[in-house]
């Protein structure tokens, strides 16, 4: 693994725990925490589902790249990326060269349990959210693994934080 340079970038599907774990890691490291989805919505002045409605996924992805470019240059950060941030090669290259990238992995069934009551996820507003999560998982899991410096199972938050802290100190 490359040396930890003070930038921790979390990738993974929606519901993997990137935001929850990211906040915990930032607190433990005494770093600033950023959630790219939150930053996109704040910059746009509207929630993400509205961006998807008005601009489609492509418009959202363009905004995502712009926000990643702004955040990635900041020192001592923990950055939680959106689940689809790695879909663009430009984003993958940017995050790979900028920090330590961790794939928070969880199976689709766990992801569904964690996102079941969250109506702010446009990609899950379908008749069969589990089938959609399985489809996203099949398509994205290999990309996450390729992009990440290492993969961590995101089961118990406290244990995952400890695992990450150990990995970063190597």
From Swiss-Prot:
Its cofactor is Mg(2+). Its EC number is 2.7.1.71. It is an enzyme of class 2 (transferase). It catalyses: shikimate + ATP = 3-phosphoshikimate + ADP + H(+). Signal peptide: none annotated. It comes from the Bacteria. It holds the Pfam family SKI. Pathway: Metabolic intermediate biosynthesis; chorismate biosynthesis; chorismate from D-erythrose 4-phosphate and phosphoenolpyruvate: step 5/7. InterPro entries: P-loop_NTPase (IPR027417), Shikimate/glucono_kinase (IPR031322), Shikimate_kinase/TSH1 (IPR000623), Shikimate_kinase_CS (IPR023000). Transmembrane segments: none annotated. SUPFAM superfamilies: P-loop containing nucleoside triphosphate hydrolases. GO terms for biological process: amino acid biosynthetic process; aromatic amino acid family biosynthetic process; chorismate biosynthetic process. Keywords: Amino-acid biosynthesis, Aromatic amino acid biosynthesis, ATP-binding, Cytoplasm, Kinase, Magnesium, Metal-binding, Nucleotide-binding, Transferase. Mg(2+) binds at residue 19. Substrate binds at residues 37, 61, 83, 140. Its main location: cytoplasm. Binds 1 Mg(2+) ion per subunit. ATP binds at residues 15-20, 121. GO terms for molecular function: ATP binding; magnesium ion binding; shikimate kinase activity. It is found in: Cytoplasm. One of its GO terms (cellular component) is cytosol. Catalyzes the specific phosphorylation of the 3-hydroxyl group of shikimic acid using ATP as a cosubstrate. Monomer. Belongs to the shikimate kinase family. This is Shikimate kinase. It comes from Neisseria gonorrhoeae (strain ATCC 700825 / FA 1090). The lineage of its organism: Bacteria, Pseudomonadati, Pseudomonadota, Betaproteobacteria, Neisseriales. The gene is aroK.
């Amino acid at each position: 693994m490359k040396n930890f340079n003070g930038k921790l970038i979390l990738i993974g599907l929606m519901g993997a725990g990137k935001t929850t774990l990211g906040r915990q890691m930032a607190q433990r490291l005494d770093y600033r925490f950023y959630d790219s989805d939150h930053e996109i919505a704040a910059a746009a002045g509207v929630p993400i589902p509205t961006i998807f409605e008005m601009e489609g996924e492509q418009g959202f992805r363009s905004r995502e790249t712009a926000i990643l470019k702004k955040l990635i240059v900041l020192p001592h950060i923990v950055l939680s990326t959106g689940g689809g941030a790695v879909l663009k090669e430009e984003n993958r290259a940017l995050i790979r060269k900028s920090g330590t990238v961790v794939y928070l992995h969880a199976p689709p069934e766990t992801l569904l349990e964690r996102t079941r009551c969250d109506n702010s996820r446009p990609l899950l507003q379908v008749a069969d959210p589990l089938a959609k999560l399985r489809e996203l998982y099949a398509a994205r899991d290999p990309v996450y693994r390729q992009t990440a410096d290492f993969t961590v199972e995101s089961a118990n938050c406290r244990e995952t934080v400890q695992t990450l802290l150990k990995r970063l100190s190597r």
